[in-house]
Structures are given as C-alpha cells and as structure tokens.
Amino acid sequence: MHLAVFGGTFDPPHNGHLAMALFARELLPADRILISVSDNPLKPACGASDRQRLDMAELLSLEINRTGMNAEVTGWELQQPRPSYTVDLLRFVRSSHPDANLTLIVGEDSYQDFPRWRDPEGIFALADVAVFRRRGEDESDEIAGDSRVRCIAFDAPVSSTMVREFSATGKSLRGLVPETVMQYILSEGLYREA
C-alpha cells in the first residue's frame, strides 16, 4: 500500500489542497491519503479553533472520497505537546502502517522552511517527499538539487491566506474552497474581520 501523508494547518482547507490530493493519487500513485491537521510552529495562528480545522479537514476528506480515493483525517498532532513535529507524525504513521510506502506531501512554501524542521534526515529515512510547486515559479536550487525530493508542478491559484482575506472582506469563497467548507466557514462565522 502507498500512503500519502498530507499535513498542514488547513486554516482553512481549499481547492488547492483538494487538487494536491487528487494529483497525489494519480502521480505518486497513492492508494490512501492521511490528512493530518496540525499547528505550524513557524506561522502564527489565524482564527479557526482546532475543532473547526478538524471539522473542515473532514469535509475535505469527504470531497476526496467522492472521487474514489480513500482519505481519512487525524488530529494526532493536535493531541501532542506543542509544537508537534512532522518526523514524530511519520514515526506514528509508520508504527500504525509498518508495511506501507509513505510519501510526505508538502507545498513548496512549506518546503522552503524544511531545513528548520526538526530532524529533516529522519523525515527522509521514514518517507519519500513530494513537493508541489506552483507552475510559473522558478524552481529553487534547494529543491532542484535534492534527489530525495520529487517535484510536482502544480497550478493552484488559491491559498488559505487568500481565503481568509476574501472572507474578512465579504467576498465570495465560491471556487476557492469546496462548497461544504464554504458553508461551514459561513455558518461558523470564521475569518470575519475583527
């Protein structure tokens, strides 16, 4: 079994996250995807609670499952002492799935901070790493020079920051997030300007 591990804050999950999961199914190829909701110790918190981010990640997993892929969500990292680290998540996943081939999915923006992550070599020992980089951006020397990283060009003109900004200014989120996530954001009153 090939298991893709997709960690992030998912504050909120958006159509780019959905597309990354679907690309992972086709290009890695991944049989299952594990969406791990976490805090990012390198970024400030943005507004949704842990419970709300887990709820929205569950909605994202339902969208992924509708396409025929097997996706599940874990809040394991949120239950760990803060900050949690990707290497610890991968150790946990490895203990639960000892025979699985693991691939860690990360966006290029997150990978730029990879040298600052806890135990990068441990991460490479536990999993392959697939970096999704936005098309049209120059590939960094760091990514291009690392044979342990699989680079996947990817079009996703949306980010969680954009979704939060649109929500704060009352702009429509349609087309930026799955419909169910949009309804959740609206019903919970998330990301409104203070």
Curated annotation (Swiss-Prot):
Its EC number is 2.7.7.18. Pathway: Cofactor biosynthesis; NAD(+) biosynthesis; deamido-NAD(+) from nicotinate D-ribonucleotide: step 1/1. GO terms for biological process: NAD biosynthetic process. Pfam families: CTP_transf_like (PF01467). It catalyses: nicotinate beta-D-ribonucleotide + ATP + H(+) = deamido-NAD(+) + diphosphate. CDD domains: NMNAT. It comes from the Bacteria. Keywords: ATP-binding, NAD, Nucleotide-binding, Nucleotidyltransferase, Pyridine nucleotide biosynthesis, Transferase. InterPro entries: Cyt_trans-like, NadD/NMNAT, Rossmann-like_a/b/a_fold. One of its GO terms (molecular function) is ATP binding. The keyword Kinase does not apply. Disulfide bonds: none annotated. NCBIfam families: cyt_tran_rel (TIGR00125), nicotinate (nicotinamide) nucleotide adenylyltransferase (TIGR00482). Belongs to the NadD family. Catalyzes the reversible adenylation of nicotinate mononucleotide (NaMN) to nicotinic acid adenine dinucleotide (NaAD). This is Probable nicotinate-nucleotide adenylyltransferase. The gene is nadD.
